[in-house]
Amino acid sequence: MMEGLKKRTRKAFGIRKKEKDTDSTGSPDRDGIQPSPHEPPYNSKAECAREGGKKVSKKSNGAPNGFYAEIDWERYNSPELDEEGYSIRPEEPGSTKGKHFYSSSESEEEEESHKKFNIKIKPLQSKDILKNAATVDELKASIGNIALSPSPVRKSPRRSPGAIKRNLSSEEVARPRRSTPTPELISKKPPDDTTALAPLFGPPLESAFDEQKTEVLLDQPEIWGSGQPINPSMESPKLTRPFPTGTPPPLPPKNVPATPPRTGSPLTIGPGNDQSATEVKIEKLPSINDLDSIFGPVLSPKSVAVNAEEKWVHFSDTSPEHVTPELTPREKVVSPPATPDNPADSPAPGPLGPPGPTGPPGPPGPPRNVLSPLNLEEVQKKVAEQTFIKDDYLETISSPKDFGLGQRATPPPPPPPTYRTVVSSPGPGSGPGPGTTSGASSPARPATPLVPCRSTTPPPPPPRPPSRPKLPPGKPGVGDVSRPFSPPIHSSSPPPIAPLARAESTSSISSTNSLSAATTPTVENEQPSLVWFDRGKFYLTFEGSSRGPSPLTMGAQDTLPVAAAFTETVNAYFKGADPSKCIVKITGEMVLSFPAGITRHFANNPSPAALTFRVINFSRLEHVLPNPQLLCCDNTQNDANTKEFWVNMPNLMTHLKKVSEQKPQATYYNVDMLKYQVSAQGIQSTPLNLAVNWRCEPSSTDLRIDYKYNTDAMTTAVALNNVQFLVPIDGGVTKLQAVLPPAVWNAEQQRILWKIPDISQKSENGGVGSLLARFQLSEGPSKPSPLVVQFTSEGSTLSGCDIELVGAGYRFSLIKKRFAAGKYLADN
């Protein structure tokens, strides 16, 4: 084949140039050119060489630039051919030779011009064909990215007028062709398979939310009373109480999806959600005064004291029963459910479906698994008996049903929602236990290897459980994407209140399926599956992380890395367009996360330095509830804007030790430190102001939703992500008209869903907009139903609180801040 690629030395018709070719390849490097009969003679050889450099732009007929004489077109079009199919060079008139001033050497070359090259082309052998076919992949791999020169044979800037395509018929060969370089077809590597890229980017957000549903918010400890309500859009199994207890609530909070699924999951809302939506429509809006009933879940069976005890991890048999009396059981808003140990286990925020709670009053969808106490009391008792069993509890559940329903619902009660076992210890590994939602290292998902800290004798990493296949960090494991325990997309359990937790699997920062997302403190109340430790840094699991089981190793003199996360949930109820009727309640929690290797460090250093930290902007908080087992504070401090706390190190060490024994595969341990409410200033404290207007007629219904991004509610203006507006429409909708912007209509559940990727000051009109829709009805008129809104935000809090360490021995490797919509409703 290589010989077949060689270039012939054929000369374009009418050209007198002789290209000396020493290798029979017709190299165009020669400078000597003989002028055509009509070409003006060159005054010098140098001029000839210069002119030769210009030959690159010869005319299409092969004549050089400056050729003005008549062209023998007939001869050009039908040249004489020899027996081999080559065109016969015309004889040059003697007068031509006398006009040039070339040296004798040129004349000799002229004589050689009539020489012919005998080129043989070897046909491709069958064996070669097979060989080539067999090495196609190898060639692609080896030269796929090599850009070949467009004209490998040519070395001179001048093009060879006689270059002719090989393999042409004799007639075609006779026709000179311009040797313009043809861009070579460079073999390119086939595009990476989308499946291969999946691990890099993670599964679709919606799938992640499905898994996140497992994160269903835990009922907020009664400590808070109305504490953090579940996102209205999410139907949380934990929320057993009807939406508002007072005036007919728009919907049962459980029905309301706890968190807007970050992925903007499909409208499909768990049947439970539909039910909740139905209830919402049926029930009258709660009165403004009935704030608690609106936001506080009604956990009927539990007493506030019991919840408080469960909320806190107790190292002693006795647990403080004196949870702040301020919080009433009803206030006990479902705190984010302790996410199951496995990221997938934790309910991912369901598709907006969770918001579906507002869905029309159709028959309730599948029973809210979350709602069912699932023997929540029993679970709570177990939790009280073993503070840390909570973590294991989820893991023990083997059937998705058990976990999805019972566990999801159970987690909230067992660990008083406020505190998932004070330490949602091994976030990933932890079971439904409140803090365990961290999803640090669920068996299904690979644990993120902790970066070993300097240590003379780093402990060997714990063995990887067979159930946890080792995956590259950032690559979601199969288990992460579809955990057997994760609630079905339609599961009634509310997705974690805050879909904040992105699945950790994809990339450490934006993975969608990881348990971390599930474990992530759904902003609601679920303890953020705070962080995972990797390469010397902590990453909030909700952001997604690849977990590795390697323990943290460090020397006795090294500062211990600690991560902190503030997760807040904003609950709001908007009535019409009257700002004075807006009811707002903001709850939050502060969690500290420790690398798993810290237990080994404490074992080698039984008297570690006391961990002391200071909360800044403390004056903006109210009803602050420190973990009674782990935190101490000085109430005599004069500065109202800051509050200093120190950790009871013996209790912390004992707790972490127990957790490490129960969850040896965990890579980090989350410990709930503070629960609090934020002083709210009405509608001014809501990051997204809403107003809904209905016009219901027998044959049609017009719906208008106005929203406005409010930067004043945040200490740092950050975008609201994955904003979803869900409204159930009854009256037998037969046709959807004039929907602006485009929305998704779920005919089965009779709900309309708008999804907006983000709303911020950079959005059109500065974050101010409207949603419009007209519905044709067959059984109208419709009855106005509550609008459920979900969103998440990272990088800021509504309280403006911050934290800093006091003293030596520790350092913050990460401080995470985020907030999300809890029960965010608007009515006509």
From Swiss-Prot:
Origin species: Homo sapiens (Human)
Residue ranges, annotated region (Interaction with DPF motifs-containing proteins): 561-567, 593-595, 667-670, 813-818
This protein's name: SH3-containing GRB2-like protein 3-interacting protein 1
Function noted in UniProt: May function in clathrin-mediated endocytosis. Has both a membrane binding/tubulating activity and the ability to recruit proteins essential to the formation of functional clathrin-coated pits. Has a preference for membranes enriched in phosphatidylserine and phosphoinositides and is required for the endocytosis of the transferrin receptor. May also bind tubulin. May play a role in the regulation of energy homeostasis.
Gene (UniProt): SGIP1
Lineage of producing organism: Eukaryota, Metazoa, Chordata, Craniata, Vertebrata
Tissue/organ expression: Specifically expressed in brain.
Residues covered by the MHD domain: 559-827
Subcellular localization, as worded in the UniProt entry: Membrane, Clathrin-coated pit
Membrane topology: Peripheral membrane protein
